[in-house]
Amino acid sequence: MSRTVFCRKYQSDMEGLPRPPFPGPKGQDIFDHVSQQAWKEWLHEQTMLINEKHLNVMDPEAKRFLDEQRDRFLNNENYEKAEGYVPPAHDANK
């Protein structure tokens, strides 16, 4: 059975994550206040940032950067986006 959370990104009741995305208070906060949709969108953004900026996720500085960008993304604040990325156009005929 899915659970519902009031998503801080979308300011709406939405389907929540099945479990915290990682241990600790921050993981629990995300579990309690971020929808599954918002989390999936963040993972996509995170992947683009890692690839575009050639981040080594084992580097503490890169981890701090991604943590900060994640918090900004999930709180609807300005965050760094992958440079040059243009979302694909949706074809209305499909």
UniProtKB/Swiss-Prot annotation:
Q: Listed GO molecular functions?
A: iron ion binding
Identify the keywords attached in UniProt to this record, alphabetized.
Answer: Iron
| Entry GO CC | cytosol
Organism domain of life: Bacteria
Q: What does this protein do?
A: Could be a mediator in iron transactions between iron acquisition and iron-requiring processes, such as synthesis and/or repair of Fe-S clusters in biosynthetic enzymes.
Question: What is one process in the GO biological process aspect for this record?
Answer: cellular response to oxidative stress
Which Pfam families did the record assign? Iron_traffic (PF04362)
What is the name listed in the Swiss-Prot or TrEMBL entry for this protein? Probable Fe(2+)-trafficking protein
User: Which SUPFAM superfamilies does the UniProt entry name for this protein?
Assistant: YggX-like
Similarity comment: family membership = Belongs to the Fe(2+)-trafficking protein family.
Tell me the organism: Alcanivorax borkumensis (strain ATCC 700651 / DSM 11573 / NCIMB 13689 / SK2)
